[in-house]
């Protein structure tokens, strides 16, 4: 039986311990060699004073490197710290970590994908892999008497690993926190082959950093390499003493760490190039920024997974973009009845295919049972022949000195189960023939009916709204015209009276003061004009 991939991986990465424990490691310092990195929100492009906090003041701190080139030491010995094996040796090159003549410790294995050039880390990995392969070969080659079928180990293998469940739960929790939609039906997929981790830069507004570190051990060096970086803008960059380009357009915020070794809180990493670091020694040749690391997980909606499984041209997907996974759900809601009809047809087709698959499974079970019956007949025939040949010595079991094994034929149970499966398949096929793809649409009617009322109101408003508006406009216009017609006789009567008083001459009998419509001031001014006419007439 082949060992599962994840179990084999964990077995290879664990160092082997000998009976004689190595001496304790001496890579200790009296004062804290590292500080935790803190900062405030800064304006883009500005470099403010560093904010950091020291830990383990006055207490020794163990420091080890995750990678040590073969050219940095002549010899290396094993040492022990916190029940973990490390390598230790003196540096022979001034450019190596620590400097010339300094005793430095590094990890037993380097990380995956990195080689120290044939040094002790590569040799230890090769040795341990050979030991594991030898143990597996010995286990598989060792023969033991048959004692019945034991499926307990198979169940343990098939059981989901605890760390894998924790990884899925953490990813799902983060997905719910950052996604605008609250996804409930989705598929979270991990690749079977090895793929690099994904780097997500720390956002500018992130300030949720822990201020406590519970360990006194520091690992300096890359932890993961060959990262896949999702975004290259709005980065929180780190300014070292040898950094010259502080006007990089990709960096929206700059932070300045101390010059000695410093570490980030748990869950945050320095990404320099394509490698991730937990601690740095205050200098780096490439630009570094703060980032989160997430596994190469892909999020699918049900429709996306269907499109991915069916035989269509497959486009490359970006892993763990959980923050845009609601596109399929929103598209289904936006298309309305059309999308519901498409989904109904898809489920109808899937039900028919599943029915056919169950039929083939039933046929396979019948075929396997026939093979078992044939094999059992052959075994019983051989058993009778062996009993006849070894009858003088008491039979086959006594001749071998083992317990006698007997075959219990349970083909009737298998036949009965297959008959039940066939009955279910036939009943399901009849239901699908009676319902049809459009019959499944009736199951969606309780969801469609609440939308029909508002939809009908909108359609009626669009159809009859312009007519009603025109009627209202015509009614208001007619009322205004009627009011104008009622007011015109009064206005004309007043105008006629006023014109008659000024234009017509006064009669000889009438008095000047009897003129209507003329104010007293106008009458007084009109009297001198009338006297010459009266004198001329006389």
UniProtKB/Swiss-Prot annotation:
> Region Essential for the fusiogenic function: which residues?
465-484
In terms of Pfam families, this protein maps to:
TLV_coat
Arranged from A to Z, the UniProt key words for this protein are: Cell membrane, Cleavage on pair of basic residues, Disulfide bond, ERV, Glycoprotein, Membrane, Signal, Transmembrane, Transmembrane helix, Transposable element, Viral envelope protein, Virion
Question: According to the UniProt record, where is the region Immunosuppression?
Answer: 380-396
Annotated segments matching region Fusion peptide = 320-340
Instruction: Give residue spans on the Extracellular membrane side.
Output: 31-443
Give the region (Disordered) as residue ranges: 494-538
List the InterPro entries hit by this protein, alphabetically: TLV/ENV_coat_polyprotein (IPR018154)
Whether Signal counts among this entry's keywords is yes
Free-text description of this protein's post-translational modifications in UniProt = Specific enzymatic cleavages in vivo yield mature proteins. Envelope glycoproteins are synthesized as an inactive precursor that is heavily N-glycosylated and processed likely by furin in the Golgi to yield the mature SU and TM proteins. The cleavage site between SU and TM requires the minimal sequence [KR]-X-[KR]-R. The CXXC motif is highly conserved across a broad range of retroviral envelope proteins. It is thought to participate in the formation of a labile disulfide bond possibly with the CX6CC motif present in the transmembrane protein.
What's the domain remark here? The cytoplasmic region is essential for the fusiogenic function. The 17 amino acids long immunosuppressive region is present in many retroviral envelope proteins. Synthetic peptides derived from this relatively conserved sequence inhibit immune function in vitro and in vivo.
Similarity remark: Belongs to the gamma type-C retroviral envelope protein family. HERV class-I W env subfamily.
Under which name does UniProt file this protein?
Syncytin-1
Q: Which organism is it from?
A: Hylobates pileatus
């Amino acid at each position: 039986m082949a060992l599962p991939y994840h179990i084999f991986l964990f077995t290879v990465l664990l160092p082997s311990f000998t009976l004689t424990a190595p001496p304790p490691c001496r890579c200790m310092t009296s004062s804290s060699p590292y500080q935790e990195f803190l900062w405030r929100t800064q304006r883009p492009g500005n470099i403010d004073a560093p904010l950091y906090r020291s830990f383990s003041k006055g207490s020794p701190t163990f420091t080890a490197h995750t990678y040590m080139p073969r050219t940095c030491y002549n010899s290396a010995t094993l040492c022990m710290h916190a029940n973990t094996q490390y390598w230790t040796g003196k540096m022979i090159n001034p450019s190596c970590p620590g400097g010339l003549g300094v005793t430095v410790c590094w990890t037993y294995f380097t990380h995956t994908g990195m080689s120290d050039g044939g040094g002790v880390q590569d040799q230890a990995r090769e040795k341990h892999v050979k030991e594991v392969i030898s143990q597996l070969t010995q286990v598989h080659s060792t023969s033991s008497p048959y004692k019945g079928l034991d499926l307990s180990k198979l169940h343990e293998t098939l059981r989901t690993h605890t760390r894998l469940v924790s990884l899925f739960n953490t990813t799902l929790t983060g997905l719910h926190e950052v996604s605008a939609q609250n996804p409930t039906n989705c598929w979270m997929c991990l690749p079977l082959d090895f793929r690099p981790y994904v780097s997500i830069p720390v956002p500018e507004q992130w300030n949720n950093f822990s201020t406590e570190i519970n360990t006194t051990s520091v690992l300096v060096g890359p932890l993961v390499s060959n990262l896949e970086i999702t975004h290259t803008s709005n980065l929180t960059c780190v300014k070292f003493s040898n950094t010259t380009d502080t006007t990089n357009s990709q960096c929206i915020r700059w932070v300045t760490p101390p010059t000695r070794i410093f570490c980030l809180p748990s869950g945050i990493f320095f990404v320099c190039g394509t490698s991730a670091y937990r601690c740095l020694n205050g200098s780096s040749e490439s630009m570094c920024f703060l980032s989160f690391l997430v596994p190469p997980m892909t999020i699918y909606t049900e429709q996306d997974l269907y499109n991915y499984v069916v035989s269509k041209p497959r486009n490359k997907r970006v892993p763990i973009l959980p923050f845009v996974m609601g596109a399929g759900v929103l598209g289904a809601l936006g298309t309305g009845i059309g999308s519901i009809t498409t989904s109904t047809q898809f489920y109808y087709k899937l039900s028919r295919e599943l029915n056919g698959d169950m039929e083939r499974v039933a046929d396979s079970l019948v075929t396997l049972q026939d093979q078992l019956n044939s094999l059992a007949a052959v075994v019983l025939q051989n058993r009778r022949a062996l009993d006849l040949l070894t009858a003088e010595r008491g039979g086959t079991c006594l001749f071998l000195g083992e317990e006698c094994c007997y075959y219990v034929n349970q083909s009737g149970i298998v036949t009965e189960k297959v008959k039940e499966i066939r009955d279910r398949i036939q009943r399901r096929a009849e239901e699908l023939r009676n319902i049809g793809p459009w019959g499944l649409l009736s199951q969606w009617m309780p969801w469609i009916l609440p939308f029909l009322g508002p939809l009908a109101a909108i359609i009626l408003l669009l159809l009859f709204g312009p007519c009603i508006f025109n009627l209202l406009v015509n009614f208001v216009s007619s009322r205004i015209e009627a009011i104008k017609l009622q007011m015109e006789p009064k206005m004309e009567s007043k105008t006629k009276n006023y014109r008659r008083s000024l234009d017509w001459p006064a009669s000889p009998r009438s008095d000047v003061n009897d003129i209507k419509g003329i104010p007293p001031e106008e009458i007084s001014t009109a009297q001198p004009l009338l006297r010459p006419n009266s004198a001329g007439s006389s």
